[in-house]
Amino acid sequence: MSRIGNKVIVLPAGVEITNNDNVVTVKGPKGELTREFSKDIEIRVEGTEVTLHRPNDSKEMKTIHGTTRALLNNMVIGVSEGFKKELEMRGVGYRAQLQGKKLVLAVGKSHPDEVEAPEGITFELPNPTTIVISGISKEAVGQTAAYVRSLRAPEPYKGKGIRYVGEFVRRKEGKTGK
């Protein structure tokens, strides 16, 4: 029994769902998201509740059931509240700037790294060492944040690099001299 798949998705005020042959469109105050789901899972919209039903209890159907429900729930949360990830930069001279929709990072390389904001993603800089990535698609926000972090992932000796706010970086001790 898929526990997540059996949970009912309750639609907040101002959110509409349309299901056209398992191509689901979710509209809300922050925008609109569309995604195609497996034809094996039946998606029923009844007023302000969405339920998902699977044809049988095979292992594959249970996994698709839970995944579909989680993706659909994330779409509903995205168009009503949105998602955001915060990154912090640690290191001497590490800073970020915004040039239009482009994020320019100085992270100890001979050249600045430039990151173009994908469609539906916005960058904010509360201060030069903090980056806030926000949007309505959880997948796009997470992927963009992971890409920015990968430009200079935190290293274990001094802890320099780009990390998620609250991320714990395990520190190592350096070599000891003779």
Swiss-Prot record:
The keyword Electron transport does not apply. InterPro entries: Ribosomal_uL6-like, Ribosomal_uL6-like_a/b-dom_sf, Ribosomal_uL6_a/b-dom, Ribosomal_uL6_bac-type, Ribosomal_uL6_CS. Coiled coil: none annotated. It holds the Pfam family Ribosomal_L6. Gene3D superfamilies: Ribosomal protein L6, alpha-beta domain (3.90.930.12). One of its GO terms (molecular function) is rRNA binding. SUPFAM superfamilies: Ribosomal protein L6. It comes from the Bacteria. Keywords: Ribonucleoprotein, Ribosomal protein, RNA-binding, rRNA-binding. One of its GO terms (biological process) is cytoplasmic translation. HAMAP family: Ribosomal_uL6_B. Part of the 50S ribosomal subunit. This is Large ribosomal subunit protein uL6.
